[in-house]
Amino acid sequence: MKTNKLVYGLFGLMALASCSDKMDYSETVVKDKDYVIQTFEKVGGFMTDIYNYADYDYGQNFGGGMLASATDESVYSVSGTSIETFYNGSWSPSNAQGSLWSNMYKGIKTCNVVLKDFQDLKFEDFELNADYQQQMYRYENYKWEARFWRAYFYFNLVRQYGGVPVIDPEMAAADVNNQPRKSSDEVFQYIFDECDAVKDSIIKDYSDLGSMALSTAEDGRANNLTVLALKARAALYWASPLFNPSGDKERYHKAALYTKELLDACEARGMKLAAKYADLWSTNNYKDADKKCEIIFGRRIYGTKISSTDPSDNVVESYNYPFGIDMAKASYSASGRNCPSQNLVDAYEMKDTGKGINEAGSGYDEQNPYAGRDPRFELTIAKNGDLWPTAANYKKAALQTYYGGVNAEPLVGATPTGYYLKKLLHGDIDLT
């Protein structure tokens, strides 16, 4: 944990020394334990900082490239970027790309500090405050939140690196970097054990706390459904061929049981599928119960500038709006970067039959290939002839994604697949 210290200039020290032979003062170290434990707010702020280490993938790590563009789901329209590392043979332990390793261990360290240094506090100075019991209720939950997050960080590590060192809160700093790697099975078991230890103790529903509720909303914090979801997802990875090359059926069985436990808990909580697919990424959907009804746990992402010269705060739209919709704008306006592949397009089944397009009796028509597909297709993929984005300034001409079209090759940076991304984007945003 970094310590921020007060620094005094040489001239200032000399001036103070000239006034007195002795000077009694105490420094306040911003993240010192004794400073943090003074109030509920400081401990809560330290705990909430852990949420900043949650990973997300909107192209922020790879020059605009989402991890889908490292797979056969998408093709990145610009060459020479770091996303290519994943498929050109240069990805390795010494060239891992991104900051997942360091960020996850920073998060783990912060969790361990909470669990070691910030337990069994009483906050006696605030016992007469009207909200003392509510604040203590929140504080007592922090240890369960921290343990969930620590398990989450280890899940992100094990799924990418396999076995990793597991760091105990009581380890001396000198010993931390000398820990051997646990096997992947040991790390997964650690995650399962932590989830089991936390699931019945962590707050179940922040919207139904009764007398323990605070005046401010607490949407977005980890609850018991979050813990069950982590356990179920980790079990699915543990049962996958990557970690289960022998095909151990008991792992499949456990993954199914853990998922059933999660689904039953979600049903009991009244969760359901959102009425509209696009509600899952709509503006301020976390404020609308009908739009967030199927989101177990999510990270809110606000617009971030791509560069100091880019006037837009709508980074996802800037990266992925179709190339060529506004050629007069700066290069970052509409970059058309993550382009859905034909493989992804072909994966969408037929709505009426539920069959894949290559299955007999599916109802697929080669002369009208996009008709009758799973409705999510139209909300995910922009194709030739679509009026996209929907902002008035862009709905002047249909997309031309055929070779030689205004949104297509051979223009450098245009889609190499004939498709552009819609999912996650707000089409009503005007970047001009």
Task: Give the role of each language-model region.
Residues 1-28:
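Bacterial Sec-dependent N-terminal signal peptides
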Residues 19-67, 93-95, 348-371:
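Membrane-proximal, proline-rich intrinsically disordered regions
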Residues 41-48, 52-56, 79-162, 176-189, ...:
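Conserved, well-structured interaction surfaces
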Residues 156-160, 165, 206, 237-246:
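Short coil/turn linking the two alpha-helices of tandem helical-hairpin repeats
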Residues 219-230:
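Amphipathic alpha-helical protein-interaction segments enriched in hydrophobic
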Residues 233, 237-240, 256, 260-366:
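Polar, glycine-rich mid-to-C-terminal structural blocks
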Residues 353, 362-432:
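Flexible, polar/acidic helix-loop-strand segments at domain edges
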